[in-house]
Amino acid sequence: MKRLFLIALIILLAAMGGILIIQRTQVDTDVTAQTTKVGIFTNGEFMDRSWGQTHYEALESLKEELNLEIIYKEHAPGDCYADIKELIEKKGCRIIIGCSFDYGKAMQKAAAEYPHTYFLHAGGVYHQENYSSFFGRMYQARYLSGIVAGKKTKTGELGFIAAFPNSQVIRGINAFTLGVKSVRPDAVVHVSYCKSWTDDAPALNSCLKLLDNFPIDVVAVHTNSMAPHQEADSRGVWSVGYHRDNRDLFPNTYLVACVWDWQIYYREQILNCLQGKFHGRQDWIDKEKGMVSLSPSPHLDMDTAILVREASEKFNSRGFDVFYGPIKDNQGQLRINAGESMSDDEMLNGFDWYVEGVTVED
């Protein structure tokens, strides 16, 4: 049994780029001779074992190499212009990083006012000469996690606790559902919105609403809160993590996680800033570049690991993507024709509908 698990784990690691490649970048010591101040802010905390911590760990890993002084600001509001102004004028930051979708308008305003400061917006949708928005194709990892969840469910009913119904979140819900239905066509994904990215109480309430009313045996999340995982664990319900691998907290019920690694991107962009090569743009990073991946898991059987590997290889070969038609919405309307696919712009900004199999319970 142990041998089969090890083989399945190796297959999964290979599929998701988990075979570690140490990438040594020759850093121009002239541009890193002086300390560069980087200001980064988020709507939660940086040691949250979730979204905030993934950014913290990436920047800390680069601090010595790139000679950075990093100023962390937690619980920044959506209207964070005053915080940005303080980081630039009082703290002397040359690079500003915002870690919430909600910061778009404030960062746009600041970027226009401070043209010699560089802005990086995680999960944003705007860009200008000194301002880039960036994200990874996390929907691909979501699809793969859906395969894992679809193979694990016995009831065919799964839950999804999500923060807000914007295009980014709905894209993830839809991708997860399509992954589930690729192996369990009769499955239903019940969605509850907790209306918060970070708060435990509403995330727990959404989880309770789903688990108390439906025979759900797997839950997935798009929230930074650990509360849904804790509740699922207390009931013996499987959970699918997001942002960071937290299987050490829930070893018996944490099925798999869709995780971020920002290190390569931050190194590249900070060096571009220091070398005068930065040009603002919308960056949407492919899975094979290492920004998004699926965590290893001791709870996968061989068949599931092979299915994940095969789907991942299709992504890497560009022979398949999640939103290739035909795809119907949950009202029965054909949204994507056979032989067609959604454009990047449609996927980034146009998701206001759900695929077949999703029911929103709010």
Residue ranges, per PLM feature:
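Positively charged n-region of N-terminal signal peptides that target proteins for export
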Residues: 1-4
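Hydrophobic membrane-insertion alpha-helices, especially the h-region
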Residues: 7-20
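A residue-level marker of the well-folded mature domains of exported/periplasmic proteins
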Residues: 20-362
